[in-house]
From Swiss-Prot:
Methylenedioxy bridge-forming cytochrome P450 involved in the biosynthesis of isoquinoline alkaloids. Converts (S)-scoulerine into (S)-cheilanthifoline, a precursor of sanguinarine. Catalyzes an oxidative reaction that does not incorporate oxygen into the product. It comes from Argemone mexicana (Mexican prickly poppy). The chain crosses the membrane at residues 4-24. One of its GO terms (biological process) is isoquinoline alkaloid biosynthetic process. Optimum temperature is between 30-35 degrees Celsius. Belongs to the cytochrome P450 family. It is found in: Endoplasmic reticulum membrane. One of its GO terms (molecular function) is iron ion binding. This is Cheilanthifoline synthase. Optimum pH is 7.5. It catalyses: (S)-scoulerine + reduced [NADPH--hemoprotein reductase] + O2 = (S)-cheilanthifoline + oxidized [NADPH--hemoprotein reductase] + 2 H2O + H(+).
Length: 494
């Protein structure tokens, strides 16, 4: 959002806020007497809103950290103040060492609609309900044995995806946008883990893809009312609420026919049906798997492909490693990816540079605690800036340069690449501690398999000679490309 738009928004909010105050209708929320970490000076009503424009949120906050330190406070309108953590040691204290103290959530009001009033894994506070739901997902659907039993189906889907890409690109001089293909492939993978291996509902695949796209779009415009409650009556916010309800109805119509079935015992749906959950919670839990799994996996794969288009030497080095494992005479198998250290390094470097959730999900203290020895009151909101941590030059030398080699032990004797142990512990793409992403292992596996397969089958290059793909970011809770990758693909001859 450019500075002109931010100026307009700020002006409107100031006028509305002053009017509300003069009319005696402003809320008088009593903030804690806690001494908040020093941050930029706030203005009445709008807090620090005027200082949060001009770039994507995580970059703005990373720049503020250079001025105010690795732990500081920002005030976003009528929200409680938010503590921003931009250093790995402090992040580790919040996420791991005192994980239970910081395990509650602070979610935008609009998320209530699609989360059964915050009754899912990502939105609910830690407690018996959260623990049971997370245990069901990981201990039933996402067990290594259950995931491995579907490798042959992943490989079949990948073969179909590659054939579709080739056919579609052939009609357009080899030009292709890979994102939508990868989204639908991920929906199929997750659907089998949710409903069973015999899942074949293409209507759900396409419908869920479009529903998730709409939720991401709406989320980018619906957060103003969380900061300024008097904005809840604005037509734009009411429109966003209506749109979310409409998307929810579409999702319900896609999922409901499957709920009445008798799912296999190794599926997420089976677990959900064995609990005392109403239909709204079951649908919310299923939607959450898609919501957190589809865009994150597909978009990270496309970010990786974008870097490989820009860095052809790295792409060819990766291709040679893949061929060394496959022998060049067969397609990539899921089991192959753990034999490819350079592939793993490319993945890590992609997630370092473009963490899919650069500010993670907001944490809230569940009790009085401390940070760096200073008291933090119960109910305080903390956001960890993963982007800032991943771009710390003291940990990652030349942090804005794409260098997978920094994560390889056999070349890491070069001190200019950084300390590999420190870098590994500072890579928090899936967060850390008790609220670490429940689907982390599946996400890493699908990302590695998808990337290896696409590089094995196609050479990826610029769609227009000499014009490198854009790395600009469009942040709507997750880190998307402002201009999704369009590349030229050429079949490789093995």
């Amino acid at each position: 959002m450019d500075e002109t738009i931010w100026l307009i928004i700020s002006t409107v909010i100031i006028v509305l806020g002053i009017a509300k105050f003069l009319l005696g209708k402003s809320s008088s929320s009593s903030l804690s007497t806690m001494e908040w970490p020093v941050g930029p000076k706030k203005l009445p009503i709008i807090g620090n809103l005027h200082q949060l424009g001009g770039d994507v949120f995580h970059v703005v906050l990373a720049n503020l950290a250079k001025v105010y330190g690795s732990v500081f406070t920002i005030w976003v309108g009528s929200w409680r103040p938010m503590i921003i953590v931009s250093d790995i040691d402090k992040a580790w204290e919040v996420l791991v060492n005192k994980s239970s103290d910081y395990s509650a959530r602070d979610m935008p009001d609009i998320t209530k609609i699609i989360s059964a009033n915050w009754k899912n894994i990502s939105c609910s506070d830690s407690g018996p309900f959260w623990h049971n739901l997370r245990k069901g997902l990981q201990g039933v659907a996402l067990t290594p044995l259950n995931v491995a039993s579907q490798y042959h189906l992943q490989e079949r889907d990948m073969k179909n995806l590659i054939n579709s890409m080739y056919k579609d690109a052939s009609r357009k001089n080899g030009i292709l946008k890979p994102l939508d293909y990868l989204k639908e492939e991920t929906v199929r993978l997750l659907s089998r883990l949710i409903f069973g291996q015999d899942f074949q509902d293409e209507k759900l695949v396409v419908g869920m893809h479009h529903a998730l796209d709409d939720l991401v779009r709406i989320s980018g415009y619906a957060s103003l009312a969380d900061a300024f409650k008097f904005c809840e009556n604005l037509p734009s916010h009411k429109k966003s609420i209506r749109e979310v309800h409409e998307v929810k109805k579409r999702v319900e119509n896609l999922i409901r026919p499957h709920i009445v079935s008798n799912p296999p015992t190794n599926t997420y749906l089976y677990f959900l049906k064995t609990q005392d959950f109403n239909e709204d919670i079951i649908i919310s839990a299923i939607l959450e798997v898609y919501d957190l799994g589809v865009d994150s996996t597909a978009s990270t794969t496309v970010w990786a492909l974008t870097f490989l288009v820009r860095e052809q030497e790295i792409q060819e080095k990766l291709y040679r490693e893949i061929v060394n494992v496959t022998g060049g005479k067969r397609s990539v198998k899921v089991e192959d990816v753990n034999k490819m250290p350079y592939l793993q390094a490319v993945m890590k470097e992609t997630m370092r540079m473009k963490p899919i959730a650069p500010m993670a999900i907001p944490h809230k203290t569940s009790k009085d605690t401390s940070l760096m020895g200073k008291k933090i009151n119960k109910g305080s909101v903390i956001m960890v800036n993963l982007y800032a941590i991943h771009h710390n030059p003291k940990v990652f030398p030349e942090p804005y340069k794409f260098m997978p080699e920094r994560f390889l032990k056999d070349v890491n004797s070069d001190e200019s690449l950084g300390n590999i142990k420190t870098m590994e512990s500072s890579l928090l793409a899936f967060s850390a501690g008790m609220r670490i992403c429940a689907g982390m292992e599946l996400g890493k596996l699908q990302l590695a398999f998808g990337l290896a397969s696409l590089v094995h089958e196609f050479k990826w290059s610029c769609s227009v000679d000499g014009k490198l793909p854009d790395l600009s970011e469009d942040h709507c809770f997750i880190l998307l490309m402002k201009n999704p990758l369009e590349a030229k693909i050429t079949c490789r001859i093995h």
